[in-house]
Design a protein with these regions (language model features):
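Short, small-residue alpha-helix embedded
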Residues: 34, 157-158, 216-240
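Charged C-terminal helix
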Residues: 67, 242-280
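Single conserved hydrophobic/aromatic residue that forms the stacking wall/gate
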Residues: 1-13
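Short pre-catalytic strand/loop immediately N-terminal to key active-site residues, enriched for Gly-Thr
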Residues: 22-28, 206-220
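Conserved N-terminal subdomain of the carbohydrate kinase-like
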Residues: 14-21, 41-124
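Conserved phosphate/ATP/ADP-binding segment of small-molecule kinases
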Residues: 132-206
Length: 280
């Protein structure tokens, strides 16, 4: 915060804490950078973005992906950090090995306090968003520098090679990911049967978060949303356990208030709180 005070921006910082997402664009607005920015705003931080790829997608699927060049990605990161240093950073879709290396090398120069890595691999509709040859760089370079990694069950299975069918399996896989170097791992159990169970694992911490499973079809962008919600709460000064708990509550209510948009799997309602106040 001294950085802001030295530039005469102390009061601005208190009003709007800057947060950054580095991820792909979703043309339908439900996931990716669009979901991240909506989440940052809903929670009360100032959202900034670095686009890594442009996707042509809607509620029915992903139809095309075009990566941006490493040079423009690096330039975006530099432009943000050199002017508005983010209090926390979330990294989502990074599809190629070259892009991962470019991002890692650039981010290292700035060493953000909180780096949340959401290891996006496959879209909800089944479209592969991470090239097979990029997985090695994700594991070798990006995950080790993270403050928190937020894999779902299929992603954790891909990273660890462990088949996950229970909370015990989630713990084993999470501990294996923790060995790669991040400070914390949040294993998201939404793909398992029963209640929605997430497991937070770190040094001297093992906490199981349980919430009711909602019978809603509109869940497009839930993974992006919870990881960016955690990023925003960390930026606001909450500790890791509080950040996860508050973000679980936020995503649960956003799903509860989700609405039909398009012909497929619709988005969650990022601004449900404002809708409720408007109705009142």
């Amino acid at each position: 915060r001294d950085y802001y005070a030295s530039r005469g921006l102390g009061d601005v910082y208190k009003r709007q804490v800057p947060t950054l997402t580095i991820a792909g664009s979703d043309s339908s607005g439900g996931a990716g950078v669009q979901a991240d920015l909506k989440t940052f705003s809903a929670i009360g931080t100032y959202g900034m973005s670095v686009i890594t790829a442009v996707t042509a997608q809607n509620t029915e699927g992903v139809f095309a992906v075009e990566e941006l060049s490493g040079e423009i990605i690096k330039s975006q990161i530099k432009a943000v950090f050199d002017d508005i240093e983010p209090a926390a950073v979330k990294i989502g879709m990074v599809s190629s090995p070259e892009i991962i290396v470019d991002i890692v090398n650039t981010i290292k120069k700035y060493n953000p306090s909180f780096l949340v890595v959401d290891p996006v691999m496959i879209s909800k509709s089944g479209y592969s968003l991470l090239k097979p040859e990029a997985k090695e760089n994700l594991i070798k370079y990006l995950i080790p520098m993270a403050y928190l990694v937020t894999p779902n069950v299929p992603e954790a299975e891909e990273i660890t090679g462990i088949k996950i069918n229970s909370v015990t399996d989630m713990k084993l896989a999470g501990e294996k990911i923790l060995e790669l170097g991040p400070k914390f791992v949040l294993m998201k159990g939404g793909h398992l049967d029963g209640d929605a169970v997430d497991v937070l694992i770190g040094e001297n911490i093992f906490h199981v978060f349980k919430s009711k499973r909602l019978n809603r079809k509109n869940t497009h962008g839930t993974g992006c949303t919870i990881s960016s919600a955690i990023t925003a709460h960390l930026a606001l000064g909450y500790d890791i356990k509080e950040s996860v708990a508050l973000s679980k509550k936020y995503i649960t209510e956003a799903i509860e208030h989700s609405f039909d948009m398009g012909h497929g799997v619709g988005p969650v309602h990022h601004f449900y709180k404002f809708e409720e106040s408007k109705i009142k």
